[in-house]
Amino acid sequence: MAYFLEQTDSEIFELIFEEYKRQNEHLEMIASENYTFASVMEAMGSVLTNKYAEGYPNKRYYGGCEVVDKIESLAIERAKKLFNCQFANVQAHSGSQANNAVYHALLKPYDKILGMDLSCGGHLTHGAKVSLTGKHYQSFSYGVNLDGYIDYEEALKIAQSVKPEIIVCGFSAYPREIDFKKFREIADEVGALLLGDIAHVAGLVVAGEHAHPFPHCHVVSSTTHKTLRGPRGGLILTNDEEIAAKIDKAIFPGTQGGPLMHAIAAKAVGFKENLKPEFKAYAQLVKSNMQVLAKALQEKNHKLVSGGTSNHLLLMDFLDKPYSGKDADIALGNAGITVNKNTIPGETRSPFVTSGIRIGSAALSARGMGAKEFEIIGNKISDILNDINNVSLQLHVKEELKAMASQFPVYQQPIF
């Protein structure tokens, strides 16, 4: 496959190879990123990309779907087994598509959504004013206490006041566990449905390293990459037959046309990997590595949102620093450490500048890095931030970390 691409489009081939080198030589620590399995990429690059299959298994609008019916059915069964639930829709193209389909299925225009505030760790699709959800529905938000933990009492008071039709519990930048049971109690109190968005922690959930959203959530959405290490894509789960039927209609024909059968096959492959005992060990490593990193940073007197972490990510707090999240992002990037600037609770800077950075452990754990490496990384991050304008230091650290990264190759060959 690489041979044909090199011959037919050398520009793209060389850029892919350049990105392969970057991923190998840099330390990828963006919390939403991971290295997928080679077998997943093989399925993604298969002849399945040629097949249209509007509809669902055994209920297609196109002919020639006998094989892809088997593939999608297998993906569904594996998802149900993995998450221990009765119904699964594997067609959503992304996590955002999954969330929008849930709203389309269960809400009417201008119904009310209650989700986590964006600056406190929520996601755009949880009701942010700039997103589709903030325009088509009435959106309200809950936040965190001064200690950085979700303020469940505030969430209850807001829910009692606005009476939302759906409450979203989930995040894109929250370093602690979600208490699904508490959220269900709040939802029941006001007669709301509860959507658990576990896009970030799904891999931890299925490995028993994070609380499970079932039986508390009426419906659960997720991505299939991030901590699951599968292909880029979305997933919707439920134990309610009526909700499942509405979800299916909301995906097709409600918000999508033909499903991406190569992606669905890749999801099935990923789910099989997630069901292996080795994946539990991986999820444990993700959490333990993040604890090592948090400890290393705190020992150097760096402030973390909520005082630490209980999952795969942490947030560094620069509210009292002369430099911003953007400054830290650039400096660490120059040193070969890829993170992202992130708004944090009590934010005083713009979303394009921010007062924090988000750091994740999933990708480097997938490479096999452990406590020793994460302690080194924590110390290097501290060195860079403590002398943030020292470009020569950044370049020196980059070479040191490049040598360390070479001991943990991402893949054995550059292109699949």
UniProtKB/Swiss-Prot annotation:
InterPro entries attached to this UniProt entry: PyrdxlP-dep_Trfase (IPR015424), PyrdxlP-dep_Trfase_major (IPR015421), PyrdxlP-dep_Trfase_small (IPR015422), Ser_HO-MeTrfase (IPR001085), Ser_HO-MeTrfase-like (IPR049943), Ser_HO-MeTrfase_PLP_BS (IPR019798), SHMT-like_dom (IPR039429)
Keyword terms: Amino-acid biosynthesis, Cytoplasm, One-carbon metabolism, Pyridoxal phosphate, Transferase
Binding of (6S)-5,6,7,8-tetrahydrofolate, residues: L118, G122, H123, L124, E242, S350, P351, F352
Sites bearing N6-(pyridoxal phosphate)lysine, chain numbering: K226
EC number: 2.1.2.1
Cofactor: pyridoxal 5'-phosphate
Site (Plays an important role in substrate specificity): H225
Reaction catalysed by this enzyme: (6R)-5,10-methylene-5,6,7,8-tetrahydrofolate + glycine + H2O = (6S)-5,6,7,8-tetrahydrofolate + L-serine
Listed GO MF terms: glycine hydroxymethyltransferase activity; pyridoxal phosphate binding
Any single biological process term in GO: glycine biosynthetic process from serine
Subcellular location: Cytoplasm
Subunit structure: Homodimer.
Name the UniProt record assigns to this protein: Serine hydroxymethyltransferase
Organism the protein comes from: Helicobacter pylori (strain Shi470)
